[in-house]
Amino acid sequence: MARLNRESVIDAALELLNETGIDGLTTRKLAQKLGIEQPTLYWHVKNKRALLDALAVEILARHHDYSLPAAGESWQSFLRNNAMSFRRALLRYRDGAKVHLGTRPDEKQYDTVETQLRFMTENGFSLRDGLYAISAVSHFTLGAVLEQQEHTAALTDRPAAPDENLPPLLREALQIMDSDDGEQAFLHGLESLIRGFEVQLTALLQIVGGDKLIIPFC
């Protein structure tokens, strides 16, 4: 058997996540997959919550490739690119959004979060508003992926409503939704958020005469 370490535990857990979903991901099943006794696993992960936290960090480390702004990039472009990358990372794994729910920045992510916040304040946001803008986009992305993954999982269990029973606008709306893999609806909502931040920021910068924004939106 290959030497057991934290990386091999995480690799096996990600495989098991894709096989069973988050509800089937247990420390007992993970130990079985690794061919070890459950107490041995506790040397690497103490419980399921610790395992999920580790998976959330690892998913982003492996697949979230736009966590920092590029040189000269606008804040609008960064929020957009960051959200799209975050979405792609969550979609790489079954129940990826559920894994990420309720997590907080890991110590390995502190510098990234600090850089993001500094970038937003350098672009005119107060710390509070920059934080809320980043959080709003993150929460929207997480919710959109959660809904998409839950919808996909439910397709096999829930029969489709007969078209003849649907009102005309609802029927057309469902056709629009069925023709979209979730990306177009996501981008539409994301742009609406960013435009809203633009309006608020522009209005407040005008109030303070173009100086650096130091008052919150609320």
UniProtKB/Swiss-Prot annotation:
Domain of life: Bacteria
Expression triggers: By the [Mg-tetracycline]+ complex.
Annotated gene: tetR
Protein name: Tetracycline repressor protein class D
InterPro entries: DNA-bd_HTH_TetR-type_CS, Homeodomain-like_sf, HTH-type_TetR-like_transc_reg, HTH_TetR, Repressor_TetR_C, Tet_transcr_reg_TetR, Tet_transcr_reg_TetR-rel_C_sf
Residues annotated to bind Mg(2+): 100
Binding site residues for tetracycline: 64, 82
Residue span(s) of domain HTH tetR-type: 3-63
Entry-linked SUPFAM superfamilies: Homeodomain-like, Tetracyclin repressor-like, C-terminal domain
Known DNA-binding region: 26-45
Subunit structure: Homodimer.
Species for this entry: Escherichia coli
Pfam families assigned to the protein according to its UniProt record, in alphabetical order: TetR_C_1, TetR_N
GO BP terms, alphabetized: negative regulation of DNA-templated transcription; response to antibiotic
Molecular function GO labels: DNA-binding transcription factor activity; metal ion binding; transcription cis-regulatory region binding
